[in-house]
Swiss-Prot record:
Pfam family, one: DUF249
Protein name: Protein MGF 505-10R
Organism: African swine fever virus (strain Badajoz 1971 Vero-adapted) (Ba71V)
Entry's family note: Belongs to the asfivirus MGF 505 family.
Keyword Membrane included in the entry's annotation: no
């Protein structure tokens, strides 16, 4: 419990003036050998109305002198006990340390406040549970090189400890200690210094790492694969966008190659690519362009690579198309199209492979990006026998109305060259026909046109089936048959002609067509090649 005197001492900031020495002593505000002691603000004290010190500095001085009363007062004024311990160590006042030892807690917390190596080591000794390794580790953390030098022989006897201290110094970025360990002791592995340098982008630490590495290579029979290590460092630096690190590595024999610049491309460090692009062979630049497409590099990087090749990429067109499709990276296609000179159109090549190998979604996305017409895609799909694509693209472009779909697909058939492609589109048309409600009188006109379309394209089975369906309507079937016979004769379609002949006979026996109409139809040039009129003569005899 505080006495009244202690409460006054704690809270008095301005002393009545003047007060004699005896009164100050009675108040406990007199420091022997220094004079009156007065608190100023929260953090400072005034000695003899003249000298100003921080409370903690005054506390250290009082503890060094062993002045317990002043120490007690300054602690009352919220001084830091750690400074009292430091002062006590400086003055070898172990009685004072013993008095406050229970309040100290962890002595390691005091170490950052100590500048003197001897006091640092004495403070560490206060903790009975610690060993030499603990001291050395804290010496590294707080940059106490002289302590390490003092225990050099002991460290040298423990190789594992040397490595531990070196790695700790790297993580703490204590360059002086790192250099001393590197030159004075034997280190098995130097990788930590480079790892930390990369992690913190610390060039000075990286340079120091190479200083120690070259020292190790030149003075020890070290089993170091230097070219491989340099290449690894270049790749790591390129991936991190650390150009200065790369230049430092090159000083020691590093070589910038495809793998290094690929790392820069992957992590979008265009400036590094720009710095070295003219130092690598043209063949390497082409490979980098292919990788940039694969990595979906941004526009500026692709333009940089293309311009370094003067946009002459014809020799790698197939590989470009392959990467564009496999990695959904179409930007390079757009850039090549934007050129006024040396323009290269890869749209058809990419679209052809998409239609052959990719999904409907990918194809539609590409169509949207490059304004590709559905007719173009459907023709490609027909050539590749991708019926599903024909149906899906058609419905997406023209809706789900049968007549609209058939109209557009018929037009495509007329302009399609490969017969296999025509057949597939005709198959699609017939599939739409079979799955629609066209067998009604209102659709008679459209069925009539579709039948003639089949006849024109020699679609025998489709023609035969639609004739059977059209006959059910009992509409202009005779007209259809006669017109289709003319088409068959003109285009030399014997199977269509035979189907027509069968229906003409049927119509004749039913009385739906006259002999004169038949003879007129069969009077066409070369008609006798396809039909035999003997059946008509036999019918007359009967």
């Amino acid at each position: 419990m505080f006495s009244l005197q202690e409460l006054c001492r704690k809270n008095i900031y301005i002393l009545p003036y003047p007060l004699g020495k005896h009164v100050l002593q009675q108040l406990g505000l007199y420091w022997k050998g220094h004079g009156s002691l007065q608190r100023i603000g929260d953090d400072h004290v005034l000695l003899q109305q003249d000298l100003i010190f921080s409370i903690n500095e005054a506390l250290r001085m009082a503890a060094e002198e062993g002045n317990n009363e002043v120490v007690k007062l300054l602690l009352l004024w919220e001084g830091n006990l750690h400074y009292a311990i430091i002062g006590a160590l400086e003055g070898d006042r172990y009685d004072l340390i013993h008095k406050y030892y229970e309040q100290i807690g962890d002595c390691h917390k005091i170490l950052p406040l100590i500048q003197d190596p001897q006091i640092f080591e004495k403070c560490h000794e206060l903790s009975n549970s610690c060993n030499i390794r603990c001291l050395l580790e804290h010496a590294v953390k707080h940059n106490m090189l002289s302590i390490l030098q003092k225990h050099k022989d002991q460290i040298r006897l423990h190789m594992a400890l040397t490595q531990i201290l070196f790695e700790l110094a790297c993580h703490e970025r204590k360059n002086d200690i790192i250099r001393w360990i590197g030159y004075s002791l034997h280190i098995y592995h130097l990788e930590t210094i480079f790892d930390v340098a990369f992690a913190h982008k610390n060039l000075s630490l990286y340079v120091l790492g190479y200083e120690l590495l070259m020292h190790k290579v030149n003075t020890e029979a070290a089993n170091i694969d230097l070219p491989n290590l340099l290449s690894y460092h270049l790749r790591t630096a390129a991936a991190g966008g650390l150009l200065n690190f790369m230049l430092e590595t090159i000083k020691h024999g590093g070589c910038v190659d495809k793998t290094v610049l690929s790392a820069a491309i992957r992590y979008k460090h265009r400036k590094i690519v720009a710095h070295f692009i003219h130092q690598v062979p043209r063949k390497t630049v082409k490979k980098l362009l292919l990788y940039a497409v694969q990595a979906r590099a941004p526009k500026k990087t692709l333009n940089l690579l293309l311009s370094s090749l003067n946009y002459a990429v014809h020799t790698i067109t197939k590989q470009l198309v392959h990467n564009v499709i496999n990695y959904s990276s179409t930007l390079v296609v757009k850039l090549l199209l934007m050129r006024r000179k040396r323009k290269l159109n890869l749209v058809d090549a990419v679209l052809a492979r998409l239609v052959k190998y990719s999904t409907y979604t990918d194809i539609v996305q590409f169509m949207g990006e490059f304004s590709v017409s559905p007719e173009r895609v459907i023709k490609m799909a027909a050539r590749e026998s991708r019926t599903f694509l024909i149906e899906m693209i058609s419905k997406a472009a023209w809706g789900n109305h049968p007549q609209t779909l058939i109209h557009h697909l018929k037009h495509l058939t007329n302009t399609m060259k490969p017969q296999s492609g025509k057949d597939l589109i005709i198959y699609t048309i017939h599939y739409i026909y079979l799955n629609s409600n066209m067998l009604v009188a209102e659709e008679e006109k459209n069925i009539f046109k579709l039948a003639k379309f089949y006849a024109n394209h020699n679609a025998v089975n489709r023609f035969k089936q639609i004739c059977e369906d059209y006959y059910i309507l009992d509409a202009r079937f005779k007209t259809l048959i006669l017109e289709c016979f003319e088409i068959a004769v003109q285009k030399n379609y014997p199977r269509i002609a035979n189907i027509v002949d069968d229906y003409i006979r049927f119509l004749f026996y039913r009385g739906n067509i006259t002999e004169e109409e038949i003879r007129e139809a069969y009077s066409l040039k070369d008609a006798e090649v396809y039909v035999d009129l003997k059946w008509l003569q036999q019918g007359e005899m009967v």
